[in-house]
């Protein structure tokens, strides 16, 4: 506590502190000296990596395919998958080209069950493969979560923008925003992709949906109630190389890209650390 006392916080005592720490972040709302967590038996993990790159610089087809993927996120996540993705048509990262990639995983599913979850998406993407896009899908099976983490999740990966001078915004998206209007979704993706000469990086956090929403009745699960109907958090970031362009980039992130994201799902919000 602020007076130096150490207390035990749970749903029965100091529940307001428990709510803030559990639902908002331990490092943000309190100093946690020890904790008790519930453990579960180890389960096998099936993971998938998907990488898409355009042929002949066909970024329109890449953005169309990204739209198709976004529309399938709720189905994928309700089937037990979670993970992270990123994409860009003007990447600020060194030696990176226009591309989309993700790694997703699910526990206690067979490879056959997992592949069926993606049947509809890959049937949709088939029309691009080899004609306008190069699509690479790889499946992995691991005996335990620890083996999966060591191989695919616990490795260093490039994060965010290369420059220390950058601005970002984020938006939580629910199922309706992702599935109701393909035109509206494609317009938002086209806006957050950025124009020529705008090095822009998009990150997708597939951390909602499925069991997260099933547990929404737990009032201590999140400070931000928008999480209780969120499927993905989409983050867009841009960098600038000199001070003179900083305000231009900040205005674009806030009033162009951020507004486009908010318009697609005005009822939810932003992730507090990445607003």
Question: What do the PLM-derived regions correspond to, one by one?
Answer:
Residues 1-275:
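Soluble FAD-dependent oxygen oxidases
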């Amino acid at each position: 506590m602020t007076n130096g006392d150490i207390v035990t916080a749970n749903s029965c005592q100091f529940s307001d502190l428990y709510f803030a720490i559990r639902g908002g972040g331990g490092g943000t709302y309190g100093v946690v000296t020890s904790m008790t967590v519930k453990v579960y038996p180890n389960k096998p993990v099936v993971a998938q990596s998907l990488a898409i790159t355009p042929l002949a610089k066909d970024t329109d087809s890449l953005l169309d395919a990204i739209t198709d993927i976004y529309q399938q996120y709720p189905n994928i996540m309700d089937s037990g998958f979670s993970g992270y993705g990123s994409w860009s048509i003007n990447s600020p990262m060194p030696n990176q080209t226009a591309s989309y990639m993700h790694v997703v995983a699910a526990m206690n599913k067979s490879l056959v069950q997992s592949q069926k979850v993606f049947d509809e998406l890959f049937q949709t993407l088939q029309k691009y493969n080899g004609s306008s896009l190069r699509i690479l899908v790889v499946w992995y099976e691991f005996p335990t979560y620890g083996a999966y983490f060591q191989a695919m999740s616990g490795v260093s990966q490039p994060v965010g923008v290369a420059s220390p001078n950058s601005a970002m915004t984020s938006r939580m998206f629910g199922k309706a925003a992702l599935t109701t209007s393909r035109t509206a979704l494609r317009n938002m993706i086209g806006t957050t992709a950025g124009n020529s000469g705008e090095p822009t990086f998009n990150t997708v956090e597939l951390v909602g949906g499925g069991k997260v929403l099933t547990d929404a009745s737990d009032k201590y699960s999140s400070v931000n109630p928008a999480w209780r109907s969120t499927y993905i958090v989409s983050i867009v970031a841009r960098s600038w190389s000199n001070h003179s362009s900083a305000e231009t980039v900040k205005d674009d992130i806030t009033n162009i890209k951020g507004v486009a994201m908010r318009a697609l799902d005005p009822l939810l919000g932003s992730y507090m650390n990445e607003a």
